[in-house]
From Swiss-Prot:
UniProt xrefs under Pfam families: RNA_pol_L_2
Entry-linked InterPro entries: RBP11-like, RBP11-like_dimer, RNA_pol_Rpb11_13-16kDa_CS, RNAP_AC19, Rpo11-like
GO biological process assignments: transcription by RNA polymerase I; transcription by RNA polymerase III; transcription elongation by RNA polymerase I; tRNA transcription by RNA polymerase III
Entry superkingdom: Eukaryota
PROSITE patterns referenced in this protein's UniProt entry, alphabetically: RNA_POL_L_13KD (PS01154)
Described function: DNA-dependent RNA polymerase catalyzes the transcription of DNA into RNA using the four ribonucleoside triphosphates as substrates. Common core component of RNA polymerases I and III which synthesize ribosomal RNA precursors and small RNAs, such as 5S rRNA and tRNAs, respectively.
Sequence similarity: Belongs to the archaeal Rpo11/eukaryotic RPB11/RPC19 RNA polymerase subunit family.
CDD domains, sorted: RNAP_I_III_AC19
HAMAP family linked: RNApol_arch_Rpo11
Stated name of the protein: DNA-directed RNA polymerases I and III subunit RPAC2
GO CC field: RNA polymerase I complex; RNA polymerase III complex
Subunit structure: Component of the RNA polymerase I (Pol I) and RNA polymerase III (Pol III) complexes consisting of at least 13 and 17 subunits, respectively.
Gene name, Swiss-Prot/TrEMBL: Polr1D
Keywords from the UniProt entry: DNA-directed RNA polymerase, Nucleus, Transcription
Length: 105
């Protein structure tokens, strides 16, 4: 699991605009999290970059005039976790039904 840090230099933009640095993460987390957070109505901008292909770092930017960026990030991670949990439950249910049908035939 990676670590999370806040990129220095954002203080002048207020608490609604921050860039977070995830270590040992890449496009898988970045794109999924961006897709979720970008849909929040209070978010003005959300995006990510991988600064260099040889570095295992993900820079994740959130801008909002209403809410703190750290709170939006936390909510996004919680929503992503809920989506993953739902996907696992749905998959396991469908697999059980498929296997039951296979046994019957």
């Amino acid at each position: 699991m990676g670590a999370l840090a806040e990129l220095a230099g954002d203080e002048k933009n207020g608490e609604g605009s921050r860039t977070f640095v995830f270590t040992n993460e890449g496009h898988t987390l970045g794109n999924a999290l961006k897709t979720i957070i970008a849909r929040y109505p209070e978010v003005d901008f959300c995006g990510y970059t991988i600064p260099h292909p040889t570095e295992q770092k993900l820079h994740f930017r959130i801008q909002s005039r209403r809410d703190r960026a750290i709170d939006i990030l936390k909510r996004g991670l919680e929503d992503l976790e809920g989506l993953c949990d739902h996907t696992i439950v749905t998959f396991e249910k469908e697999m059980a039904e498929f296997n039951a049908m296979k046994v019957e035939n």
